[in-house]
Amino acid sequence: MSASINIARFLCLLTPMVFLSQSSPCAQMLALSSSTPGNEIHSHLLLLYNTHTGERINVVYRQGEQYIPSALAKLDYFLRDHRTGAVRHFDPHVYDILSDLTVSVGHPGAEIDIVCGYRTPSTNESLRARTAGVAKNSLHVQGQAIDLRMPGINTLTLRRAALALARGGVGYYHHSDFIHVDTGRVRQWCFNCSASLAADG
């Protein structure tokens, strides 16, 4: 990589918190650097869309083994409880799961639709009272779980990829067309699925 490209990339990394369009020069450069073989430092880039707020974020949250605190804070805010505005610090390893899922399905850095991030205890209880499939001790409340889908990727394929990572819990919500991933113990479940779907993966 030339010195001029290195300088430009460095300037992009000085502001990892900005919301970028996927086509912006910085976003393209950071995505390229994260997938170019031979880089000394691997950049971990996430492009997320919040299905409740309509917000998008494109951010490098980790360089090599080092998480970027300011970027994590921006992601935590992005995943806030949209009903109350409350923010919780997330386990950064859940962001690694999202990043690695895009690689596993063959689309590194692809956009991920966020169905649910953080829930306050009161929000979780409210959802449990009127919605089936909401756990009493949900890891969403602990900042360890995210519900998601990926545009253009079959959700069953996404489920298989998440199970293969074996990083924590994986739930498959067939009728709502999303999966749940968390950093708890390794386990799986399939909500309102046929026996064949439950056994798949």
Positions of PLM-derived features:
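Catalytic cores and adjacent binding grooves of peptidoglycan-active enzymes
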Residues: 44-49, 130-201
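Extracytoplasmic/secreted envelope proteins and their assembly/folding machinery
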Residues: 72, 95-102, 124, 128, ...
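Extracytoplasmic/lumenal soluble domains of exported proteins with redox or metal-associated functions
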Residues: 56, 60, 71-74, 201
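Acidic helix-start/capping segments at beta-turn-to-alpha-helix junctions
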Residues: 110-126
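Loop/turn elements at helix/coil->beta-strand transitions in domains of secreted/extracellular proteins
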Residues: 55, 107-112, 166-169, 177
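Cell wall/extracellular polymer interaction/catalysis modules
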Residues: 42, 46, 52-60, 64-67, ...
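N-terminal secretory targeting signals
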Residues: 1-48, 194-201
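Active-site acidic/histidine clusters and adjacent loop/turn architecture
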Residues: 63-115
